[in-house]
From Swiss-Prot:
Entry annotated with the keyword Glycoprotein: yes
Biological processes annotated in GO: cell adhesion; homophilic cell adhesion via plasma membrane adhesion molecules; nervous system development
Key words of the record: Calcium, Cell adhesion, Cell membrane, Glycoprotein, Membrane, Repeat, Signal, Transmembrane, Transmembrane helix
Glycosylation sites (chain numbering): 419, 545
Gene Ontology cellular component terms for the protein in this record: plasma membrane
Protein name: Protocadherin gamma-A5
Keyword Cell membrane tagged: yes
Segments in the Extracellular topological domain: 30-692
One GO MF term: calcium ion binding
Record membrane topology: Single-pass type I membrane protein
Cadherin domain: residues covered: 30-133, 134-242, 243-347, 348-452, 453-562, 570-683
Length: 931
């Protein structure tokens, strides 16, 4: 068992503490406790009930009590708590005097079992005693003829405390004649002596008053003083003399009390009172005066009480012989006490390493200690040992010193600390042993990198996430400790879509939490591959990497986008054609839409939201096909408005609507003839729009008529050069003014009702589609039969005033569409489809004239919708077959059959050259009007 530290400071608040020993049968061991002195009555010493293996209430039931040995009862039992407590204040100095070890022994009797248990309580010293001189005033006499250097013996102070709390030094008040010299005796005691520094003159100063102060080594330092009165005497020639001047004697510690140890003898050659000697102890300690007795006349020393080797191995005394003339002589007396084996060995740690690095080499010294046994001979011979299962060994050094060394490599991650039990045993009979515990911590070395629990991670984040949102957390474990286990996280540098990954995701270096630095868009970014690095803070740092796959989950954040039919830029609705002869299920058009989302967020369904004629049309739920639900009747209006809704399957669903205008007619002339009779539901906004259109058409018509008049004047001046143009102008002059429509009116008509017609040779049904009108002033022409005639003549006046020639422009490939780019075909067609829309007033005039002529022919009933030479039948190359490709321009879908001429007004193509082809005859529509 290990005793607690024995150092106590004076004046501190001392808390009782207990050293719990091992409870065993009488004769095989004792219960040991330790406590500081001067505790209050009832202070806790130890849990005697626990050490006896009893409950507190069993103390009274079993008759447990303290058996005294005739001494004053110092301790008592508390029956309620089962504790051993003090019966009163215990003064160590009163109990054990100057003994270094103060132990109180008593027995505990358990009456019902008739068992006796030995108990030892060690009383630990505190600095509670001041150094004290025996007398408050000391009178010293000195001859006036004393030479410089004469020493006068002074009484030494006694300090009842032991160890560091005992006496340490002396101080003398300042004076001219004396100084203080402190002599250390062989027993370690400090003896003050007064040394004469200057000769004395009794006639000048008879008495010298000095103050001697004794100081101890406690904290705080305690002191005691005595007043020294030095009286100067007349000369005394001879001082007493001891022969020999030092005495020694050895006695066993168990000698009887009263045994005479030795006799001292001193001589003085003086006579009379100056030769009469008296013996006394100089600076006698209280322990000396209590242990030994000195006969003042004979100089005989005997024992007053028994000796204890463990309390004091030797006693050092100084005996003074003084004559009547105040001269003295002193002799040293050493009493050595012989040992009896009654002390267990002790371990004294000289040097201890509390922490050792785990990478230390085998043979590293951990501790240096010495062993000591208060006994002597075989009783003091000691053997040391430690447990064999530890990676340590003992190696003996000089004297009783030992080294504790490592025997193999240490691993902190396996064992972080050790508690090494050191056992020392003497060779006495019976042998005594002591155990001491040496704690040792293994300091960490950065030999383990951070470790991720998984080889890779994956996580997901929903798109449109807020910036700064936490998306994932990674944690790496480092089995090291301290800074070597402090892990920081970072992302490997990389780029994605031209931007660094650090602009997409950041990571908290301390927690490993990843944050989104931007709002992700599933349509732009679907996944990110990241590498997370975990680094410790060791030197050098170790690190490891783990991959993290970040997936962006789609949200329904995109409304369906309608690709076909496309809306015109002027705000009007697209127009589709349905013949009145169409049967139920006839495909009118197909609404094509896409959704940028994915999964069910992109699943689209179509429904008819509103119709001007309910029950006439139906929309395919999944195909978007607009079909007739019943046969068309004569009473059905020419213009039918359908509102088609396209909705996805997201949560919540998003939708888009599209208005389709269906023109019900078998022939294009029917459409032209019935334009004025189309009735639409009255809408306040439509009324305003109609008013604006009427005003615009009237204004444009006026401008157009003025232009025609100016043009006719110019043409009359060139009558001989433009017979064909003059004939065409004569036909236009015969048309009633009401048949003319302004340029903007024609353009609006074409944009609203531009269509494609698919005719088959074996069917009278025609499929007319009104695709999105396009906004450039170009019209594609195509050769659809063997004969062709120019549709438009362009003229240019050169410097030599040559005649204007009709030319056929080469194909314009600037906006040509290949066959693969077109939504679908329903008839034969040529691959070289070129043409341009008219973009000046003259071309517009000519186009208007031909449209009116075609309308007249259609009204005449002599030409079919397909048209031949000299008619303006509009043939379409596209039927109601569609693809998902968004076609932005449908101008090439309208052409004028029967002519291979290209409408053009490009400045660079009016060079007056003869056309390369197209020299067929052209019928004048004016003749048909006459018929």
């Amino acid at each position: 068992m290990a005793s607690p530290p024995r150092g106590w400071g004076c004046g501190e608040l001392l808390l009782p503490f207990m050293l719990l020993g091992t409870l065993c049968e009488p004769g095989s061991g004792q219960i040991r406790y330790s406590m500081p002195e001067e505790l209050d009555k009832g202070s806790f010493v130890g849990n005697i009930a626990k050490d006896l293996g009893l409950e507190p209430q069993e103390l009274a039931e079993r008759g447990v009590r303290i058996v005294s040995r005739g001494r004053t009862q110092l301790f008592a039992l508390n029956p309620r708590s089962g504790s051993l407590v003090t019966a009163g204040r215990i003064d160590r100095e009163e109990l054990c005097a100057q003994s270094p070890l103060c132990v109180v022994n008593f027995n505990i009797l358990v009456e019902n079992k008739m068992k006796i248990y030995g108990v030892e309580v060690e009383i630990i010293d505190i600095n509670d005693n001041f150094p004290r001189f025996r007398d408050e005033e000391l009178k010293v006499k000195v001859n006036e003829n004393a030479a410089a250097g004469t020493r006068l013996v002074l009484p030494f102070a006694r300090d009842a405390d032991v160890g560091v709390n005992s006496l340490r030094s002396y101080q003398l008040s300042s004076n001219l004649h004396f100084s203080l010299d402190v002599v250390s005796g062989t027993d370690g005691q400090k003896y003050p002596e007064l040394v004469l520094e200057q000769p004395l003159d009794r006639e000048k100063e008879t008495v010298h008053d000095l103050l001697l102060t004794a100081l101890d080594g406690g904290d705080p330092v305690l002191s005691g003083t005595t007043h020294i009165r030095v009286t100067v005497l007349d000369a005394n020639d001879n001082a007493p003399l001891f022969t020999p001047s030092e005495y020694s004697v050895s006695v066993p510690e168990n000698i009887p009390v009263g045994t005479r140890l030795l006799m001292l003898t001193a001589t003085d050659p003086d006579e009379g009172i100056n030769g009469k000697l008296t013996y006394s102890f100089r600076n006698e300690e209280e322990k000396i005066s209590e242990t030994f007795q000195l006969d003042s006349n004979l100089g005989e020393i005997s024992t007053l009480q028994s000796l204890d080797y463990e309390e004091s191995r030797f006693y050092l005394m100084e005996v003074v012989a003084q004559d009547g003339g105040a001269l003295v002589a002193s002799a040293k007396v050493v009493v050595t006490v012989q040992d009896v084996n009654d002390n267990a060995p002790e371990v004294i740690l000289t040097s201890l390493t509390s922490s050792i690095s785990e990478d230390c080499l085998p043979g590293t010294v951990i501790a240096l200690f010495s062993v000591h046994d208060g006994d002597s001979g075989e009783n003091g011979e000691i053997a040391c040992s430690i447990p064999r299962n530890l990676p340590f060994k003992l190696e003996k050094s000089v004297d009783n010193y030992y080294h504790l060394l490592t025997t193999r490599d240490l691993d902190r991650e396996e064992t972080s600390d050790y508690n090494i039990t050191l056992t020392v045993m003497d060779h006495g009979t019976p042998p005594l042993s002591t155990e001491s515990h040496i704690p040792l911590k293994v300091a960490d070395v950065n030999d383990n990198p951070p470790n991720f629990p998984q080889a890779s991670y994956s996580t997901s984040v929903t798109e449109n996430n807020p910036r700064g949102v936490s998306i994932f957390s990674v944690t790496a474990h480092d089995p090291d400790s301290g800074d070597n286990a402090r892990v920081t996280y970072s992302l490997a540098e990389d780029t994605f879509q031209g931007a660094p990954l650090s602009s997409y995701v950041s990571i908290n270096s301390d927690t490993g939490v990843l944050y989104a630095l931007r709002s992700f868009d599933y349509e732009q970014l679907r996944d990110l591959q990241l590498w997370v690095t975990a680094s410790d803070s060791g030197n050098p740092p170790l690190s490891s990497n783990v991959s993290l796959s970040l997936f962006v989950l789609d949200q329904n954040d995109n409304t369906p986008e309608i690709l076909y039919p496309a809306l015109p830029t002027d705000g009007s609705t697209g127009v589709e054609l349905a013949p009145r002869s169409a049967e139920p299920g006839y495909l009118v058009t197909k609404v094509v839409a896409v959704d940028k989302d994915s999964g069910q967020n992109a699943w689209l369904s179509y429904r008819l939201l509103k119709a001007s004629e309910p029950g006439l049309f139906a929309v395919g739920l999944h195909t978007g096909e607009v079909r007739t639900a019943r046969a068309l009747l004569d009473r059905d209006a020419l213009k039918q408005s359908l509102v088609v809704a396209v909705e996805d399957h997201g949560q919540p669903p998003l939708s888009a609507t599209f208005t389709v205008t269906v023109a019900v007619a078998d022939r294009i002339p029917d459409i032209l003839a019935d334009l004025g009779s189309i009735k639409t539901p009255i809408d306040p906004e439509d009324l305003d729009l109609t008013l604006y259109l009427v005003v615009a058409v009237a204004a444009v018509s006026c401008v157009f008529l003025a232009f025609v008049i100016v043009l006719l004047v110019l043409r009359l001046r060139r009558w001989h050069k433009s017979r064909l143009l003059q004939a065409e102008g004569s036909r236009l002059a015969g048309v009633p003014a009401s048949h003319f429509v302004g340029v903007d009116g024609v353009r609006a008509f074409l944009q609203t009702y531009s269509h494609e017609v698919s005719l088959t040779a074996d069917s009278r049904k025609s499929h007319l589609i009104f695709p999105q009108p396009n906004y450039a002033d170009t019209l594609l022409s195509e050769e659809s039969c063997e004969k062709s005639e120019p549709l438009l003549m362009s003229d240019k006046v050169d410097a030599n005033k040559e005649e204007r020639r009709v030319q056929q422009a080469p194909p314009n490939t600037d906006w040509r569409f290949s066959q693969a780019q077109r939504p679908g075909t329903s008839g034969s067609q040529n691959g070289d489809d070129t043409g341009t829309w008219p973009n000046n007033q003259f071309d517009t005039e000519m186009l208007q004239a031909m449209i009116l002529a075609s309308a007249s022919e259609a009204a005449d009933g002599s030409s079919t919708l397909g048209g031949g030479a000299g008619t303006m039948g509009l043939s379409a190359r596209y039927g109601p077959q569609f693809t998902l490709q968004h076609v932005p321009d449908y101008r090439q879908n309208v052409y004028i059959p029967g002519s291979n001429a290209t409408l053009t007004n490009a400045a660079g193509k009016r060079d007056g050259k003869a056309p390369a082809g197209g020299n067929g005859n052209k019928k004048k529509s004016g003749k048909k009007e006459k018929k």
